[in-house]
């Protein structure tokens, strides 16, 4: 039996960004009817972001609300190491954008993902959760 691989991800969130993440986490927990780890919320947010239009992702990264959500205040969540490849793929999607001068930081991508999850419909969130469950089971 192979050991599951996980790692810790750093979120740099302001009080506003932290509140938004917790709102997303609470919503996902309600939808699943489970006590889920914080890493599951971040993973679902990134899966939703990976499926979003690159222009929407770039816009979220460049919005003033995204800048207000960032901070030097660090939070750590554990999730499958598969999340790294999803975050990298999202970064590559938006790198050539007119709205951004270069590849966004991991922190900016995570904040955009949280914003995209906050505006997603319940059905899309549950589809992303189901996909995450399948991806993590394969590892």
Residue ranges, per PLM feature:
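Short Lys/Arg-rich basic patches
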Residues: 1-25, 29, 58-91, 107, ...
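Short, basic amphipathic alpha-helical segments that act as recognition/interaction helices
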Residues: 31-60, 101-131
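Intrinsically disordered, low-complexity, charge-dense segments enriched in Lys/Arg
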Residues: 87-94, 99, 114-115
């Amino acid at each position: 039996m192979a050991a599951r691989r996980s790692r810790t991800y750093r979120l740099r969130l302001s009080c506003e960004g932290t509140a938004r993440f917790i709102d997303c986490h609470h919503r996902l927990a309600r939808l699943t009817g489970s006590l889920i780890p914080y890493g599951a919320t971040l993973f679902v947010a990134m899966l939703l972001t990976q499926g979003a239009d690159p222009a929407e992702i770039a816009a979220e990264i460049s919005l003033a609300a995204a800048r207000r959500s960032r901070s030097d205040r660090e939070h750590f969540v554990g999730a499958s190491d598969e999340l790294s490849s999803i975050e990298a793929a999202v970064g590559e999607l938006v790198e050539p954008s007119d709205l951004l001068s270069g590849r966004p930081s991991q922190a900016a991508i995570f904040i955009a993902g949280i914003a995209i999850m906050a505006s997603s419909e319940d059905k899309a969130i549950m589809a992303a959760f189901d996909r995450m469950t399948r991806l993590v089971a394969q590892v």
